């Protein structure tokens, strides 16, 4: 596939990169044909590549950059912290400051354990649930992505689905035999699996909005149903809010939908562009982590002062005005996608929750993983390439979602809508 934009330098770098990095990339979802563009710099809602191209960015590093790239307040705070040290191996006051802010925002959060990624957070939360309940089985929803660890890397979304590996080799059957898979938004399937595994299920883990298979919202009442059935059966409810945390609202999906989980995992936005994750939840559960309890979790860079500093500065700026503006922008683009698809008679379904959105080239409603998989992925990639040629970058996969930031202004939205029109017309 030849793109009608200059990418000579990116092509050179990709050929060199393949000699040293597996597949030429450090995460599979970053790869697209014929080769990805290589970024030289980023500012606000723009990426600038090695060939001098400018792209309006709706990927936002897969979610974290809600305040835009190279935010001056975050950069200044981090630069000041760097003069004080970049890793300590002992506690610092800023860890307390950020933990307090997380607890003030997330409804279920009574205590926090900082880690280094969303993957570490979900792995730790599942271990905690198993330790607390003394049960081994977990329920996971088909197509949900909860990180790249063995407990959950089965029938998963995100890059694994994009590149045809939803069930990764290298994971022993004994590891996943305790992972029970259920279609999202299906109440009867949940009831059936719980009834067949009485007093064996430690937790249900889910993305409240499935953001790693596009954007699939929960059906009305579905999260409340999960809350009730888990309480009735002594099962912990874990919200994986690595994507939705601090994006849907100050308190993430829990505040947005009015449902309080037992545990929640966050990341991405929490680090303001630096690596971080966190496990949060009720004190009675969280205190089972060592050193207070017997459930072990540790990490050299847990509570890293650079990441924590960036997180404090980020959350300071996420107020009601921020959520109102970013939600409005995503709504404008979602409406544009619907109207433009209809204008050109293209079967499409568009889903939007707060500042998250995605289009599926499909004529049926998308409520499960199987529905998402039935979408026309070839058409999506044609749409992706045309957007790219017209200066707009979205994630190169049907099974990721788009995000708006505070830096996507009216002029940027207008350019984006023009690009959407061109892309839809070509389809």
UniProtKB/Swiss-Prot annotation:
Pathway: Porphyrin-containing compound metabolism; protoporphyrin-IX biosynthesis; 5-aminolevulinate from L-glutamyl-tRNA(Glu): step 2/2. The modification N6-(pyridoxal phosphate)lysine is found at residue 268. It is an enzyme of class 5 (isomerase). The keyword Transmembrane helix does not apply. Pfam families: Aminotran_3. It catalyses: (S)-4-amino-5-oxopentanoate = 5-aminolevulinate. Its EC number is 5.4.3.8. PROSITE patterns: AA_TRANSFER_CLASS_3. Its main location: cytoplasm. GO terms for molecular function: glutamate-1-semialdehyde 2,1-aminomutase activity; pyridoxal phosphate binding; transaminase activity. It is found in: Cytoplasm. One of its GO terms (biological process) is protoporphyrinogen IX biosynthetic process. Keywords: Cytoplasm, Isomerase, Porphyrin biosynthesis, Pyridoxal phosphate. One of its GO terms (cellular component) is cytoplasm. Its cofactor is pyridoxal 5'-phosphate. NCBIfam families: hemL (TIGR00713), PRK00062.1 (NF000818). Belongs to the class-III pyridoxal-phosphate-dependent aminotransferase family. HemL subfamily. HAMAP family: HemL_aminotrans_3. PANTHER family: GLUTAMATE-1-SEMIALDEHYDE 2,1-AMINOMUTASE, GLUTAMATE-1-SEMIALDEHYDE 2,1-AMINOMUTASE 1, CHLOROPLASTIC-RELATED. This is Glutamate-1-semialdehyde 2,1-aminomutase. It comes from Methanococcus maripaludis (strain DSM 14266 / JCM 13030 / NBRC 101832 / S2 / LL).
């Amino acid at each position: 596939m030849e793109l009608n934009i200059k990418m000579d330098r990116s092509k050179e770098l990709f050929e060199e990169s393949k000699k040293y990095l597996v597949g030429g990339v450090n995460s599979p979802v970053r790869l697209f044909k014929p080769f990805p563009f290589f970024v030289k710099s980023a500012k606000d809602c723009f990426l600038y590549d090695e060939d001098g191209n400018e792209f309006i960015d709706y990927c936002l590093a897969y979610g974290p950059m809600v305040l835009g790239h190279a935010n001056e307040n975050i950069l200044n705070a981090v630069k000041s912290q760097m003069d004080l040290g970049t890793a300590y191996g002992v506690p610092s006051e800023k860890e307390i400051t950020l933990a307090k802010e997380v607890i003030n925002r997330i409804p279920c959060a009574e205590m926090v354990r900082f880690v280094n990624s969303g993957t570490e957070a979900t792995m730790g939360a599942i271990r905690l649930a198993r330790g607390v309940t003394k049960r081994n089985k977990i329920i996971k929803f088909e197509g949900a992505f909860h990180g790249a660890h063995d407990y959950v890397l089965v029938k998963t979304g995100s890059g694994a689905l994009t590149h045809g590996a939803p069930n990764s080799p290298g994971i022993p059957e004994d590891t996943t035999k305790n992972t029970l898979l259920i279609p999202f938004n299906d109440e009867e399937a949940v009831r059936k699996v719980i009834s067949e595994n009485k007093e064996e299920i430690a937790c249900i883990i889910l993305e409240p909005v499935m953001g790693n298979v596009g954007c699939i919202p929960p059906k009305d009442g579905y999260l409340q149903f999960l809350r009730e059935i888990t309480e009735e059966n002594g099962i912990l409810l874990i919200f994986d809010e690595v994507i939705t945390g601090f994006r849907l609202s100050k308190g993430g999906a829990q505040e947005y939908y009015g449902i309080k989980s037992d545990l929640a995992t966050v990341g991405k936005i929490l680090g303001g562009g630096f690596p971080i994750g966190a496990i949060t939840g009720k004190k009675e559960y969280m205190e089972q982590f060592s050193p207070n309890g017997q459930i072990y979790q540790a990490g050299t860079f847990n509570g890293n002062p650079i990441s924590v500093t960036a997180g404090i500065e980020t959350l300071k700026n996420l107020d009601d005005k921020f959520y109102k503006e970013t939600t409005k922008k995503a709504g404008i683009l979602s409406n544009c996608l619907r109207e433009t698809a209809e204008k050109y008679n293209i079967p499409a379904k568009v889903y939007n929750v707060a500042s998250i959105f995605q289009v599926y080239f499909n004529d049926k409603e998308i409520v499960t993983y199987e529905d998402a998989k039935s979408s026309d992925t070839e058409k999506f990639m044609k749409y992706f390439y045309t957007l790219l040629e017209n200066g707009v970058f979205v994630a190169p996969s049907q099974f990721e979602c788009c995000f708006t930031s505070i830096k996507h202004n009216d002029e940027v939205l207008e350019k984006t809508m023009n690009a959407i029109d061109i892309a839809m017309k070509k389809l």
